[in-house]
Regions:
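Active-site mouth loops of central-metabolism enzymes
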Residues: 20-28
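Mid-to-C-terminal alpha-helical segments outside catalytic/metal-binding sites
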Residues: 40, 154-208
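Residue-level signal for inorganic ion chemistry
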Residues: 15, 41, 83, 133, ...
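Short acidic/histidine-rich active-site segments
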Residues: 126-146, 153, 178
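Short, glycine/acidic-enriched loop or turn micro-motifs at the edges of active sites
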Residues: 18, 54, 86, 134-136
């Protein structure tokens, strides 16, 4: 195994995936690359962070090629998360059937993100995680502050708290309960996170 696999900071493979929104991308090449990345993750039992932007059908097809079809002989469950999920109900259930969890970040804090917010309100505990995608996907408060010239749009890891508050509100629970649910789901999807969360802040820092 490569030495990097022994580093507790290495918790999975990603972000990998397909993007059907950005113009000029070689989609055939992207699919070939993702296919090989999925094979690496399967063979090395690595969790995945998967980018899916207007490419759910193609992504699900590649997952079936590599991991098999859920409920069928030979199927291997997939660990990891679908980053910034914004798909249909059918796509939601399809990704969950593989064993993946769905990620929600800054977009869930916007009142206009109706479908995203509904997904987050309906999903069972253990099926969703929180993320920031720093420095992208700013939460609503940062966007509003930016409009007033009081902040940048650069998202920071601490902004996950705003997503957690939104999750609690949408799910009708407390902030502590929502945070605990998201934390447990994240550790289940990326088991080495539990090791990383126990490390002292000074771990890995170079000394003068």
């Amino acid at each position: 195994a490569l030495p990097i696999f022994d580093d507790p900071h290495f918790i999975g493979l990603g972000e990998v995936g397909l993007d059907g929104f950005e113009p000029g991308l070689d989609q055939h090449k992207a699919e070939r690359v993702l296919l090989e990345e999925l094979k690496i993750a399967r063979d090395l039992d690595l969790p995945l962070s998967i980018h899916v932007r207007r490419t759910a059908s193609k992504t699900l097809g590649l997952l079936r090629r590599v991991y098999g079809s859920p409920g069928k002989t030979g199927f291997q469950p997939v660990r990891g998360a679908v980053h910034a999920f914004n798909g249909s109900d059918a796509e939601r259930e399809a990704f969950l059937s593989f064993g993946l969890v769905l990620g929600f970040g800054g977009a869930c804090t916007y009142d206009g993100s109706k479908r995203i917010r509904r997904h987050l309100s309906e999903l069972a505990d253990g099926a969703w995680v929180l993320e920031t995608d720093a420095p992208d996907m700013p939460p609503a408060s940062r966007r509003d502050a930016f409009a007033l010239g009081q902040s940048t749009l650069d998202t920071r890891p601490a902004d996950i708290l705003e997503a957690a508050r939104t999750a609690a509100q949408l799910r009708g629970t407390t902030l502590a309960a929502a945070a605990a649910s998201a934390r447990a789901a994240a550790i289940a999807a990326f088991p080495r996170l539990e090791i990383l969360l126990r490390l002292p802040e000074s771990f890995g820092q170079q000394t003068e």
